[in-house]
Amino acid sequence: MENSCPYGLFLKAGTGEGRIKESSMAGKDRQIGFARVLTDGVTTFYLMDFVIEEKYRGQGFGTILMNRIMKENGHLYGMLHTKDAKAFYEKYGFRAIGDTKKTEEIYMEKPCS
C-alpha cells in the first residue's frame, strides 16, 4: 500500500479550527474527516473515501482537506466517483464523464495541469 496516501482532518482541541495531521496520534484533537488517495505519483491519482463527519459539513472543513489533496496531487490526472458532491469537485477542475443518467454514481476526471 505504499501508493495509498491517507489524509486525516482533525478539529484542534479547544479552538474549533480544522487542521490536517500526518499522524494518527491525534492526542486530544477530534478526527472529523478522512480521505485516501491512490497514486503512482507521476501521472494519475484516484480520490477515494473522502468523508467529513456529517455535523461538520458545510463549514469549510471539506475544503481544507481537498485543498491539501490538490496541493500535493492537483498537477496529475485525477479520477473519482461521487453520488452527491459533483458541484464540490467541479470547483477543483473535475468534470463528470459518461452517461450520468444511467447510474447513481457520477464518475469524474480532472485533466493534468
Where are these regions (language model features)?
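A conserved beta-strand-loop-helix scaffold within acyl/acetyltransferase catalytic domains
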Residues: 2-51
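Short coil/turn motifs at secondary-structure junctions
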Residues: 40-42, 55, 85
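Conserved acetyl-CoA pyrophosphate-binding loop and the N-cap/start of the following alpha-helix
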Residues: 55-65
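Conserved active-site alpha-helix within GNAT-family acetyltransferase domains
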Residues: 75-110
